[in-house]
From Swiss-Prot:
Record-given protein name: Transcriptional regulator MraZ
Every SpoVT-AbrB domain range: 7-54, 83-126
Summary of subunit composition and partner proteins: Forms oligomers.
Signal sequence region: none
Gene: mraZ
UniProt-listed GO biological process terms: negative regulation of DNA-templated transcription initiation
Keywords for the protein's UniProt record, in alphabetical order: Cytoplasm, DNA-binding, Repeat, Transcription, Transcription regulation
One MF annotation (Gene Ontology) recorded for this entry: transcription cis-regulatory region binding
Origin species: Rickettsia prowazekii (strain Madrid E)
């Protein structure tokens, strides 16, 4: 399967290492880089994580904007300027930079949330709060999916 699914909570050690779920690593197995690209989410207080193929899609979308627009500059700064490549070690772990951990409020545990083409890393309690909000929105907007095909 080529999508990120499910939710996992893994511990973060004192060296800021955390294990990426095995099925997430399997989705990324076709990538040229043995790791992930992570950047601060511009939607939520979490870390967005993807492979190089998704970063290329974002690059193409951003390049459609006026090269001198505030929007393009902001997206380039927040996504590309803040992005880091994180290699997997032999145990499938990545080292989370302190700047990303601070953005997401992550300390001892990290909650991995599959979002299809990306996954997010949250502070677990913050994700539980967001999950309640997302459930309400999904319930209210459920009929929009019927017309999405």
């Amino acid at each position: 399967m080529n999508v990120f699914l499910s939710k996992y909570i893994n511990g973060v050690d004192k060296k800021s290492r955390v294990t990426v779920p095995a099925n997430y690593r399997a989705v990324l197995g076709k990538e040229l880089f043995n790791g992930v690209i992570a950047y601060p989410s511009i939607r939520n207080n979490c870390i967005e994580v993807c492979g190089i193929a998704h970063i290329e899609k974002l690059r193409k979308m951003i390049e459609t904007l006026d090269p001198y627009s505030e929007e393009r500059d902001a997206f380039e700064t927040m996504i590309f300027g803040e992005a880091v490549q994180l290699a997997f070690d032999g145990d499938g772990r990545i080292i989370l930079p302190q700047s990303l951990m601070k953005h997401a409020g992550i300390e001892e545990q990290a909650c991995f949330v599959g979002k299809g083409i990306i996954f997010e890393i949250w502070q677990p309690k913050n994700f539980e709060k967001y999950l309640s909000y997302a459930q309400n929105i999904a319930h209210e907007k459920r009929l929009t999916l019927r017309n999405a095909h």
